[in-house]
């Protein structure tokens, strides 16, 4: 069983006298920095000078400085910029200031797990990862609650790395719901697998394939969109709130019978074999290498795929129907 920490299990002792530098001020950076500051922790923000994020962070009341200045002043450096830019920023602007006993922290284990960032041996390496978009991290904190999260320790140089990570998690508001202790490997590999096979890859391809099947059979694209895409939210919300069994209990008997008797013909043994192959590519580093080469080349394949997605009929039909439903503005 996993270890779960709650508010009662965690104190601020390991972080209350430390300076925490949040590097980056996107959705997660802003939410985590504000929550920790409002929890009484000493937070500074490291950014590129004079950009939109710089001005926003100042307006939010933070002490804002360059990444180099923040890395030098901080005891804990919490990196919340995109995965693909982290290695270059780390090497040039953070690594020179990683003196003995400091902690380098992440919200995703990708670059540490695959070795794109290799901190010196005399620092802690930790992870504090909210399992929610940044906007919800902030909103629920302001409401007096929070979202669930993860903590992990890749290296405990000072002997209190876990307490440091947990103190940050408490400051962000995660321990009010519960924080699961994991590892950099487990977080990285399960996160990538979920994105590729279900959340971003599998679901979107299933939607498109079903939409195309109906349109090719002569059904109106608008009807196809409603039945294969628009109504998905209703089912996902039920699963989110009640679990799979709760979803089955809240759909019609016809939908339940049809789903239970036909689903294995859609997700079959070939599908499961493909899932295992994708997981293996994640585990052995092939995906990470492929993605690294794609970045270095300037994202040619990704940009081509983006163009194809934008040109698909489902996008044109969906845009019009979302406008009709008041979900998308002109």
Swiss-Prot record:
The positions flagged as active site in the entry are 108
Annotated residues that bind Mg(2+) 2 are located at 191, 227, 231
| Record note on cofactor | Binds 2 magnesium ions per subunit.
- Name the reaction it catalyses: (2R)-2,3-dihydroxy-3-methylbutanoate + NADP(+) = (2S)-2-acetolactate + NADPH + H(+); (2R,3R)-2,3-dihydroxy-3-methylpentanoate + NADP(+) = (S)-2-ethyl-2-hydroxy-3-oxobutanoate + NADPH + H(+)
Domain KARI C-terminal knotted positions? 183-328
Q: What does the record give as its pathway?
A: Amino-acid biosynthesis; L-isoleucine biosynthesis; L-isoleucine from 2-oxobutanoate: step 2/4; Amino-acid biosynthesis; L-valine biosynthesis; L-valine from pyruvate: step 2/4
Locate the residues binding substrate. 252
Question: Record's superkingdom?
Answer: Archaea
Could you say which residues bind Mg(2+) 1 here? Answer: 191, 195
NCBIfam families associated with the record? ilvC, PRK05479.1, PRK13403.1
Annotated protein name in UniProt: Ketol-acid reductoisomerase (NADP(+))
Organism, per UniProt?
Answer: Methanocaldococcus jannaschii (strain ATCC 43067 / DSM 2661 / JAL-1 / JCM 10045 / NBRC 100440) (Methanococcus jannaschii)
**What lineage does UniProt assign to this protein's organism?**
Archaea, Methanobacteriati, Methanobacteriota, Methanomada group, Methanococci
Gene (UniProt): ilvC
């Amino acid at each position: 069983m996993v270890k779960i920490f709650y508010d009662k299990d965690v104190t601020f002792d390991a972080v209350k006298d430390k300076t925490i530098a949040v590097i980056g001020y996107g959705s997660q950076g802003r939410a985590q920095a504000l929550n920790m500051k409002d929890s009484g922790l000493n937070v500074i923000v490291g950014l590129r000078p004079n950009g939109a994020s710089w001005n926003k962070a100042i307006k939010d009341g933070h002490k804002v400085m360059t990444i180099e200045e923040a890395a030098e002043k901080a005891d804990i450096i919490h990196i919340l910029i995109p995965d693909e830019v982290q290695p270059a920023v780390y090497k040039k602007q953070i690594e020179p200031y990683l003196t003995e006993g400091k902690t380098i922290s992440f919200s995703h284990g990708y670059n540490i797990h695959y070795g794109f960032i290799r901190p010196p041996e005399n620092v802690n390496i930790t992870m504090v990862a909210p399992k929610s978009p940044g906007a919800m991290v902030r909103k629920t904190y302001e409401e007096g609650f929070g979202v669930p999260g993860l903590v992990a320790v890749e290296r405990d140089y000072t002997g209190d790395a876990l307490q440091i990570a947990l103190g940050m998690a408490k400051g962000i508001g995660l321990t009010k719901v519960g924080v699961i202790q994991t590892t950099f490997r487990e977080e990285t590999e399960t996160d990538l697998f979920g994105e590729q096979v279900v959340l971003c890859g599998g679901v979107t391809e299933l939607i498109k394939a079903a939409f195309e099947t109906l349109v090719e059979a002569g059904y109106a694209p608008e009807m196809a969109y409603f039945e294969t895409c628009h109504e998905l939210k209703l089912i996902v919300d039920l699963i989110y709130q009640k679990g799979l069994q709760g979803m089955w209990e809240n759909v019609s008997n016809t939908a339940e019978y049809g789903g239970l008797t036909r689903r294995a013909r859609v997700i079959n043994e070939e599908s499961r074999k493909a899932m295992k192959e994708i997981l293996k590519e994640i585990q052995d580093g092939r995906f990470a290498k492929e993605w690294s080469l794609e970045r270095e080349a300037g994202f040619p394949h990704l940009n081509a795929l983006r163009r194809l997605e934008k040109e698909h009929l489902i996008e044109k039909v969906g845009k019009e129907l979302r406008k009709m439903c008041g979900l998308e503005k002109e």
